[in-house]
């Protein structure tokens, strides 16, 4: 693919590259009445990612939240290829956050759409959101998580305007 810019073409990769890599893969679009509150679903057993119709159209229009939803589902598809594990881990409150399939899919989506190399040189959260095609909340959450993990140096934190630890910040998901 040789993608060399911070804006990751998530829809193009899923629609055109995934079927070449996994011939059984399909991206489907579900109606709002069918999917309800589910913006996206991944069916590992049948190699399918399903997006709610409004989310699919949002990804087409490069809306940040919808791009993150698709990247999140891609995370499930690539990371959680054991259907039993994916379901069990999603529903377990007794495991550390990082072992949760939902946390992992969020972390994957953040890393995919906001490359750390770009975050290290970005001058503002607004720049991250605009260039990476994500929401400003996602840009802040990803940056804060990487800073907390010690993966962004202090000069980058100063440039982006995120302190290493905010008052009342006790950790959590990186995205």
Q: Regions from the language model: what does each represent?
A:
Residues 1-175:
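Active-site hotspot residues in diverse enzymes, especially metal/ion-binding acidic/histidine motifs
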